[in-house]
Amino acid sequence: LKGYGSVSEVQFFRGGALRINLNELRDFNFNIFYSDNYYDASSNILSGDVQSFYTDGYHRTTTEIQRKNSVKERLIGGRISYEKGSYRFGATYWQSKFSKNVARDSSLILHKFSGDRANLAGADYDIITKNMNFFGEFALSQTSALASVNGVLLTFLEIADVIFSYRNYPADFTPLH
């Protein structure tokens, strides 16, 4: 587990995480995590649905102050990973619930997300053999869209590295985090 290390001041998780290592299963790691966080958002006056999320962090005007911390997200998830020598495999799942319904025409339209719940399941791998490193990740969102990033790193005589990467993100894949 690592602490938050991004430059974004608003899209972090606020909560806790626990890593469990059992002696009998020392090649496996089990992680659970939980987050409660508030986001700045504007809501439709009639329906109360979230119309837009704001990540600028400004709270200067009356409107900006009204948006401050107006939507809560509760997220819970887990991860299991297996690591043995130069092989690593993992699976992750998280589920998120917002305190308000997010309207389809909100700022998350890019991700085709609406409603008050989101989830994502993923699997990843990292395999190192001699001068090659195969790595990748697959993720399935609540829209049942499957996205992936896969690649191989080739090292030539320790003087040059070449990376080939393939990325596939369908239009209906909804990566909220």
Where are these regions (language model features)?
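Signature for the C-terminal beta-barrel architecture of outer-membrane proteins
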Residues: 2-177
